[in-house]
Amino acid sequence: NGRLYRKDLWDEPFTGTVIENFSDGSLSLKTSYYRGLPHGQQVRNFSDGQRALEANFDQGVLVGVKSRWWPNGVIREEAYWSEGKYIGRRLWDRTGRLIKEEITPQS
């Protein structure tokens, strides 16, 4: 069903924050869950601590802007979501030059 459950209570969907760390203890991934579904902000870092990804969820559905960065800290992509539907994106190269911009027609 796509939900995350607590290990000690298999019949209860997990509500809380899941944190994954690199071997040195620094943050790799942080995701908030509500009733087993991603809810709120998700962040992922590169091993050097630089931000790699930020996304926002509303009860398992992507909303707003999902951003990704190159390892050098330059923005790589901004993907736009509304109620789980992909709207469009902008892409940049490693130097920060915008290389693509697309918008999906809404029905």
Predicted feature residues:
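Glycine/tyrosine- and acidic-biased, solvent-exposed loop/turn segments at the edges of beta-strands
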Residues: N1-S107
